[in-house]
Amino acid sequence: MQTSPLLTQLMEALRCLSGVGPKSAQRMAFTLLQRDRSGGMRLAQALTRAMSEIGHCADCRTFTEQEVCNICSNPRRQENGQICVVESPADIYAIEQTGQFSGRYFVLMGHLSPLDGIGPDDIGLDRLEQRLAEEKITEVILATNPTVEGEATANYIAELCAQYDVEASRIAHGVPVGGELEMVDGTTLSHSLAGRHKIRF
């Protein structure tokens, strides 16, 4: 179909986003051009700056435009002694929204996957081991995803922590709040039963 080359280029560029297919990209492109050109310009400027200026924190490896992110440079967080290990920067945002954690993080940017050739050094475990050896860390909270690879990664890190006499704990997995028991898969239910706790009055 004969159309604007720039419009086609815009649609193809939008398809790099996760979950955006041809139809969604077309709809987004037309919306920006028809209704919100100023918003499109802001988006372009923000993307350009983010792509060129955002790197990784030297301590935890999350995304930041500084050498060390705001969380890692916070004195109160440093005094906490806890490090929460997650697979991606998005996991930090999810945990921070709960308001239940006041320590620092370490981002793996993935998980161990020998079949894909992803080993310990590929996910920064050499850097994590260095922190275990040099910093006063009292507990490592393993918040990797509840997948086979996530569990294997958590177990590997737990063994690493044991070598440095640092306590390692795993976040609980179980039945979601508001969910119905009959709809929960067997693996999740098994984790729930294994991780049960006493009710205290």
Curated annotation (Swiss-Prot):
SMART domains (UniProt xref): TOPRIM
UniProt GO molecular function: DNA binding; zinc ion binding
Origin superkingdom: Bacteria
UniProt keyword Metal-binding present: yes
Keywords, sorted A to Z: DNA damage, DNA recombination, DNA repair, Metal-binding, Zinc, Zinc-finger
Transmembrane feature ranges: none
GO biological process: one example: DNA repair
Domain Toprim: 81-176
Pfam families: RecR_C, RecR_HhH, RecR_ZnF, Toprim_4
InterPro entries in the cross-refs: DNA_Rcmb_RecR, Rcmb_RecR, Rcmb_RecR_Znf, TOPRIM_dom, TOPRIM_RecR
Gene3D superfamilies: 3.40.1360.10, 6.10.250.240, RecR Domain 1
C4-type Zn finger ranges: 57-72
UniProt similarity note: Belongs to the RecR family.
Annotated NCBIfam families: recR
PANTHER family tied to this protein: RECOMBINATION PROTEIN RECR (PTHR30446:SF0)
Function: May play a role in DNA repair. It seems to be involved in an RecBC-independent recombinational process of DNA repair. It may act with RecF and RecO.
Full protein name: Recombination protein RecR
Organism whose genome encodes this protein: Shigella dysenteriae serotype 1 (strain Sd197)
